[in-house]
A protein has these predicted regions:
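Membrane-embedded alpha-helical hairpins and interfacial helices in multi-pass inner-membrane proteins
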Residues: 4-12, 16, 20-53, 78-195
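Generic transmembrane alpha-helix motif of multi-pass integral membrane proteins
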Residues: 46-62, 66
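Short alpha-helix boundary/capping elements
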Residues: 62, 75-76
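Small-polar-interrupted transmembrane alpha-helices in polytopic inner-membrane proteins
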Residues: 66-74
Length: 199
């Protein structure tokens, strides 16, 4: 129980940090893209990186913290950017990551018994990138489908789905690249010890 609470708090804090950084970057238009309002913020959606990393490394323990961040992040940061029904669409966002991880596990299944509880080692980045690609595509479809059903005034469009998929992909890659640079720098300056190096 204590482990689940620690994971939930860790996941929530990291996800909210990603929401905060993402919102500041898109609000101040750091890239200077001067895009139309509906495009702002969705071209590099950092919270998707938090979803993928937290689920890949903390598995199902991360879902409460991720869902809490999905429903409170927009409210605490800037609720006007989100449509009605976002708390339901957040389930679709989380399901896209869970489904992507399970698909990667299924494609790696060895002959014999297949199990949803089979471990996947994400230390090899190619599986992590595969999860990012699949979850970005699924998230673009699922979230837009759910929002179009809930908000009958908005229709689902291929451009919006594509924009969501690209934004989720770029956001997840940005989060992973940033963390990689940070931890690589800490290891190189010997502020942390590389776990792969034996004494």
């Amino acid at each position: 129980m204590i482990h689940a609470i620690k994971v939930t708090i860790t996941v929530y804090v990291f996800s909210m940090f990603c929401y905060s950084v993402w919102y500041l970057l898109q609000y101040y238009d750091v890239a200077g893209l001067r895009l139309p309002d509906e495009w702002i913020g969705s071209l590099c959606y950092l919270p998707h990186g938090a979803r993928v990393l937290m689920f890949c490394f903390f598995r199902y323990y991360s879902l409460p913290g991720l869902y809490l961040a999905e429903i409170t992040g927009p409210s605490l940061i800037h609720h006007n950017d989100y449509m009605d029904g976002w708390s339901i669409a957040a389930v679709g966002s989380l399901f896209s990551v869970v489904a992507a991880v399970e698909l990667v596990k299924w494609t790696r299944a060895t002959p014999g018994f297949f199990s949803f509880f089979k471990e996947v080692n994400f230390e090899n980045y190619k599986f992590l990138y595969l999860v990012i690609i699949v979850s970005s595509l699924l998230n673009g479809l699922l979230v837009n489908l759910i929002l179009s059903v809930i908000n009958t005034t908005s229709a689902i469009s291929a451009v919006t789905v594509f924009r969501f998929a690209v934004g989720d992909f770029l956001g997840a890659i940005a989060v992973i690249a940033t963390l990689w640079v940070i931890f690589r720098t800490l290891i190189d300056t010997r502020l942390i010890i590389d776990p792969r190096v034996e004494d």
